[in-house]
Amino acid sequence: MMTAALTGISPEVIRELKSGKSRTLELQSTHNVVTLARVETGTMVFMTSVDMEDLMAGDPGIIVEVELISISMKRIVEFALGMHFEERERMSARIKVRYVAPSTVRSATKEEITQPTMVDVIKSSCFHAG
C-alpha cells in the first residue's frame, strides 16, 4: 500500500497510539507539514520514529487513520532582556489520528524537502503459537 509517511515521531507517541486511543498531535517539522498538506481526512498514513534521512525498507512503524487535520501559521514571539523581538512565523499541522495496524516499510520515496515523503508499506502480521 502506497501512503504518506510522517517520520521522526516520538516512540512514546507511537506506543500511546497503539493502546487504541485517538490522539491529537501538533507537528512542526517542515517535511511532516509538507506531507500533511497533501493528506485528506480519512486517509491512512504511516508513522515511524525513524528520521526522514534514515527511512528505508524494513523500518517498522504504524498505520494510522487521519480523523482531523488543520494546518496553520503561528507567530513566534521571543523576549530577551526585557526587549520584545518578533523573530519569525512557524507553520504547524495539528492532526487527530487513530491507530489501525503495525506496519513495515517495503520501499521509501525521498525526493525534495518540498515534496511529501511517500512509502510503500505492508501490514505486519503477528501469529501466536498456542
Question: Across the structure, where does each feature detected by a protein language model lie?
Answer:
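Aromatic-rich, lipid-facing transmembrane alpha helices and their immediate juxtamembrane interface loops
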Residues: 38, 51, 59-62, 74
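Contiguous surface segments at macromolecular interaction interfaces
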Residues: 58, 63, 76-130
